[in-house]
Amino acid sequence: MRASARLNSYSHGGNMITLTINGQSRQVDTADDTPLLWVIREQLQMTGTKFGCGAGLCGACTVHLDGTAVRSCQTSAKDAAGKKITTIEGLGGGRPHALQVAWEAEQVPQCGYCQSGQIMQAASLLAKNPDPTKQEIVAHMDGNLCRCMTYGRIQRAIVRAAADMRSKSGA
């Protein structure tokens, strides 16, 4: 099923909610059960967050709610109201985030489909733990799937970004 067809299965229920996405307040009309993913992609036209499985199993749709990584396909827009939502478009605050720079340096992208979810998941790790071990990286990234199997590159990019972020913060 195409993404737009899936969104159309969620009616606009006459419920106006305010979402704070990437620092901007946005009003949307949505049914109570509409996943945040579809509001982000279809109503707000921010397509960096991807639809992967629709069941919260692959991680392609990962965004941050109040700094915590969540699967936007399993989070209703209504539940996200009143929280700070960050998508891949807002991660670097208008500039490339250290993870995005490291992703390119380590040549992580292949098909790129998992990329935004992987980066958002990794960013939540580095926000809590600026110097993770390989085991901590593997454990935190478990559940974010990459069909191109670039897991080694993903891990190296996270280590590189962490080192870059620590050097810039003086840690």
Where are these regions (language model features)?
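Signature of N-terminal electron-transfer/Fe-S-associated modules in redox systems
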Residues: R6-A171
